[in-house]
Amino acid sequence: VHSRALLALEARPVCVEVHLANGLPSFTLVGLADTEVKEARERVRSAIQNAGLEFPANKRITVNLAPADLPKDSGRFDLPIALGILAASGQIDGGKLVGYEFAGELSLGGDLRPVRGSLAMSLAIARPAHGTPQVLPRLVLPEGSAQEAALVPQAKVYRAQHLLDVVQQF
């Protein structure tokens, strides 16, 4: 699942990888995540359960935010982490997430809250690497963040108010 981390005024790509394994149940975040990102464990678990979806509590869950050397802060990774868990557990089709980038903080009930830097994310995807023709990724963001990201003319931005709004599309 793809997202972006803010580094000064840049929005650098981040890949959220999720692995579910048998063993002692746990939920581990790796990849230079700060305290606020590590708190995502409880927000994501509650949001998935309160949305009526199944949280794989009997599994060992490992979430990697790559690249590891890029600092990650804020709750912006809640939505991509939740989607990664839902895809890894077979509740949504992970293949349908290709071509999208996600960001959003989840409330315990599954509502999406705006995140900082959505304009930077939108600008970053609107400028593909020099000489590389490509299809621009589409952004899925909370309502307030989506309005800001939509200021970039070539950006394709989708708004969501709740985790279920996103899940129903994939």
What are the language-model segments listed below?
Residues 1-170:
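Peripheral, non-AAA+ core regions of ATP-driven protein-machinery
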